[in-house]
Amino acid sequence: PYIKDKINIVNTPFSEQLPLAQLHWIISDENESITVESMSDGLHIYDNPVGVLTNNPPFPQQMFQLNNYMYLSPKQPRNTFCENLALDAYSRGMGGLGLPGDLSSSSRFVRVAFTKVNAISGESEEESVSQFFHILGSVDQQRGCCEVADGKYEITLYTSCCNVTKGIYYYNTYENHQISAVDMHVENLDSDKMICYPVIQGERINYQNK
């Protein structure tokens, strides 16, 4: 049976302090990703070739809108406007002109997709982890830029990734940019007890001359 036949969506908040949210899910291993969406007509599962996701609009619309940006490139553009005009790429990065910069979900999807498919990581795990946080940093929500209610703002509470082979979970938070890690194989994975770690908050600044 398909996985969607075994999943039920319930009207139960994850926490009494948090409201229910219209969430879309991305499920990934080291090679591929799928998107899972619970809609009014049932559960939908899609292959996700770009390996990124934001909430709303539904995933097929997110993917379709990438057609509008097929001209973007990390390379410097050539003059295809008019060969008789001496047009000049006067700044680096002009191959990305038109990449949306607003904070809507659809624009952030395009921006992080472009960043992810073009970003080049180093060979070490540390370089890959660092590059991951740089990629998602391209769509960070800064306090004050997206007001959701009077005096309340959307922010990126935390960013996280996991090495699924080694079982190491990496994260940082809005208040602490240092990357923290939890090695799950240090714990007893056969235990029937939940293991919890406090989320490290508060910026930790490394003073080089103290």
Residue ranges and their predicted role:
Residues 13-15, 20-21, 30-32, 52-210:
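C-terminus-biased signal that marks the final domain/tail of proteins
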Residues 1-57:
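Structured, non-membrane catalytic/scaffold regions adjacent to prosthetic-group chemistry
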